[in-house]
A protein has these predicted regions:
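Beta-strand/loop substructures that line and gate deep hydrophobic ligand-binding cavities in soluble
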Residues: 83-136
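Short, surface-exposed coil-to-beta transition loops
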Residues: 4-6, 64-68, 90-95
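Generic recognition of short, well-ordered alpha-helical interface segments
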Residues: 13, 23, 49, 66, ...
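Generic structural detector for well-ordered beta-strands
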Residues: 8-12, 70, 97
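Glycine-rich portal/gate segments that line the openings of hydrophobic small-molecule binding cavities
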Residues: 39-87, 101, 106, 139-150
Length: 150
């Protein structure tokens, strides 16, 4: 079973700035707070590209895990995606799509969480928490970017 979360927001910054912040994965812990992201490491040297490896450290509801991840999409100024899976089979997929919206940027954040059979009994508890966390994290991302006006 897959938990699906889709959140959209408008950010008062140009698309290139929003995209730059989305691909700055090592800063994810600064705004993916509700999702419990504590560290993200690029595994491969050099700039991120589709296929780049990531190691994502997360603590949620007292459960710490490391997801082995990969950048799935990297289209400058338009889309960024990643996926990861932990040792117990929990998988996560994030797809972010941005578009110019008047003088701002429209961001669509899609999250998919796949739970292995042994965790499916918790799905009804995890789904609303995941929705709330995504909304809070996207709001933190928006505030962070909009407060950086210079």
């Amino acid at each position: 079973m897959t938990i699906e979360v889709d959140v959209e927001t408008t950010i008062g910054r140009p698309p290139d700035e929003v995209f730059a912040a989305l691909v700055d994965v090592e800063r994810y812990p600064a705004w993916l707070i509700a999702s419990g992201i504590v560290r993200v490491e690029a595994v491969d040297p050099g700039p991120l590209r589709a296929g780049s490896g990531l190691r994502i450290h997360q603590t949620v509801a007292g459960r710490s895990t490391v997801l082995d991840g990969q950048v799935t999409v990297l289209e400058p100024g338009a889309a960024f995606g990643l996926r990861g899976k932990d040792r117990e089979g929990v998988s996560v997929r994030i797809d972010a799509v941005i578009a110019l919206d008047d003088m701002a940027t429209r961001l669509r954040w899609s999250l998919r969480i796949g739970l292995p059979l042994r965790y499916r009994m918790f799905e009804s508890m995890v789904a609303p928490q995941a929705r709330r966390a995504a909304a809070l994290d996207l709001e933190a991302f928006k505030r962070r970017l909009e407060s950086a006006r210079g």
